[in-house]
Amino acid sequence: MATANINKSEIIAKFARGTNDTGSPEVQVALLTTRINELTPHFKANMKDHHSRRGLLRMVSRRRRLLDYLKASDADRYRALIEALGLRK
């Protein structure tokens, strides 16, 4: 199930750096994290769905690259995003 537009708008509003910001690394990582979290129950129920798992791994990889970029460019924003999304312990 895809992320609903209302939920997507809320995520963008929460993590945007400006009023019309939809492409900052924070927004992209937050949207990817939401999609990854929505897909997790699907893979617990459908363990042999390798085709969709490949898409999930692609999303995880893309999120990792965005986080690496953010960490290299602005460590404070990186730490704030990690804490807000609860990605690291």
From Swiss-Prot:
Keyword rRNA-binding recorded: yes
GO BP, sorted A to Z: translation
Keywords linked to the UniProt accession: Ribonucleoprotein, Ribosomal protein, RNA-binding, rRNA-binding
Statement: the UniProt record of this protein carries the keyword Ribosomal protein: yes
GO molecular function, one term: structural constituent of ribosome
An example Gene Ontology CC term for this record: cytosolic small ribosomal subunit
Ranges annotated as spanning the membrane: none
Subunit-structure text: Part of the 30S ribosomal subunit. Forms a bridge to the 50S subunit in the 70S ribosome, contacting the 23S rRNA.
Family, as annotated: Belongs to the universal ribosomal protein uS15 family.
Role description: One of the primary rRNA binding proteins, it binds directly to 16S rRNA where it helps nucleate assembly of the platform of the 30S subunit by binding and bridging several RNA helices of the 16S rRNA. Forms an intersubunit bridge (bridge B4) with the 23S rRNA of the 50S subunit in the ribosome.
PANTHER family per record: RIBOSOMAL PROTEIN S15, BACTERIAL AND ORGANELLAR (PTHR23321), SMALL RIBOSOMAL SUBUNIT PROTEIN US15M (PTHR23321:SF26)
Protein name: Small ribosomal subunit protein uS15
Origin organism lineage: Bacteria, Pseudomonadati, Pseudomonadota, Betaproteobacteria, Burkholderiales
Annotated gene: rpsO
